[in-house]
Amino acid sequence: LIDPGHGGEELGAITHIWETKNGVKKTKSIYEKDLALLLAKKVKKYLEKKYTTYLTRSIDRTVTLNERANMAETVKADLFISIHINSSNSKRSSGFETYYLDNHADMAIKKVENIENKFLLGDEKEVNQILIDLVIQKTVPSSKKLAKFVHDNLSSRVKKKFKMKDRGIKPGLFYVLALSKRPGVLIEAGFMSNSKELKKLRSSEFIEAYSLSIADGITSYLNTLPPKDIPFF
């Protein structure tokens, strides 16, 4: 199950660019929800050649945390792949990173968690820590392994070709991963707050290369498992 972050009234990160049309210069808003959907659709295109693949949303619509979690149960997803675009108050921040669900004490990572988790709607922000710990216990070995396969593919293809900073594989307490209750990763594809990186994120060449890297990483991970041997609740 591929999860394009945010959607609908949940915009995610926002940045603004200048565009000139018919000789008139105007500002245009760029939303994380739209960039995430573009990437997710491409990942699905590559994976569905071999695997049954679903999206939590295929259009710009609001999807609650519970709806995402319920969809994972309904389709009996083996893996949960959440795709996001990063943002920072510093316009110099750059690079891609891959997260798996686990406890940690890194304050820099907590900032990323706060950004992604704060967009959740209503009382879904309150996620039971006991549930999180149970999911971590069940999924962390598989999720960590999946994160390595995905990130290694991104590093070998995207880092060199697009000269992007590799920010590594990290543990994180993301609610969307916790409630999916299965092995999964959350991918931050790059910083839309960085103007140079934003141009890459919006380019068709980057979207193709990045989505193919994710798909290849997932395929490599699945190829290491015996049939019917992907653990989930």
Regions found by a protein language model. Give the residues of each.
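Catalytic-core regions of hydrolytic enzymes
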Residues: 1-127, 133-140, 144-148, 208, ...
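Active-site-adjacent mobile loop/cap segments within catalytic or ligand-binding domains
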Residues: 14-15, 89, 136-233
